[in-house]
Amino acid sequence: MRQILLSVLLAISTFSNAQELFSLTEPASNMPVGSVSFRVDNSIMDEINSSKVNYHLIPNIRVGASKKLMISFGAFLSNRSANQLKHEGGSIYAKYRFLSNDAIQRHFRMAAFATVSHNNSDIHQEEINMYGHNTGYEAGIVATQLLQKVALSSTLSIAKAFDNGGNNKFVYGLKNSKAINYSLSFGKLILPKEYSSYRQTNINLMVETLCQVNTGSGKHFLDIAPVVQFIFNSQSRIDVGYRKQVSSSLLRTAPKGFFIRAEYNFFDVF
């Protein structure tokens, strides 16, 4: 009975602040220690100057390794280089929370994160993206502020691209292989108005802005992404959003489209 109660409390503590569980960026908060989640990300993006749709499927296994550390393992699949879904690579992501200033219905947290990615697909755009496109690394910090039903989060990171596998060279030159990424995300809990059970469905609305500046060329892009999120039984979630380019001087092959995330969490696994 005690283990069941602990699992329920973990679920409530994780998803009662679901308005900070953003879709395109990670908050500074971590998964509960001992938890494991299975996540599937789907991107359905319109290719420029074409009727083709770029579909990327990225399944992830995420582990709450400790109170401060979480680790994620992802695989990259897409239809871009073939007419069927093809495995193209994978990544390892880690996040370490180094600051927590918590109070009732509010907190401020900061974390450092890093990603190492390997990809075998052709390099087809100037944008540097470690989540399904480039081989390389990304490292940065994230700060998240929760104030009752509203969450604000911001990230700052640097990304470095290398040649992709399969003899797919980074064709834009060594000088243009680094970029600075930054983002600002806003989330608000819409329903329920009052909590009476951890089984209540949560509905959150979010808006995320994402920007990249290439340190060599100075070229940039700015995107905006509205998202609606559903949390079920404090254990699973579905996010549906639309990402749209606001401005860009970088070559990008698919700058707008829909994304869908499905995730299920297991608490107190180890």
Q: Which residues make up each language-model segment?
A:
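Sec-dependent N-terminal signal peptides
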Residues: 4-13
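Transmembrane beta-barrel domains of Gram-negative outer membranes and organellar outer membranes
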Residues: 18-154, 158-163, 173-270
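Extended low-complexity, intrinsically disordered segments associated with secretion/export
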Residues: 168-170
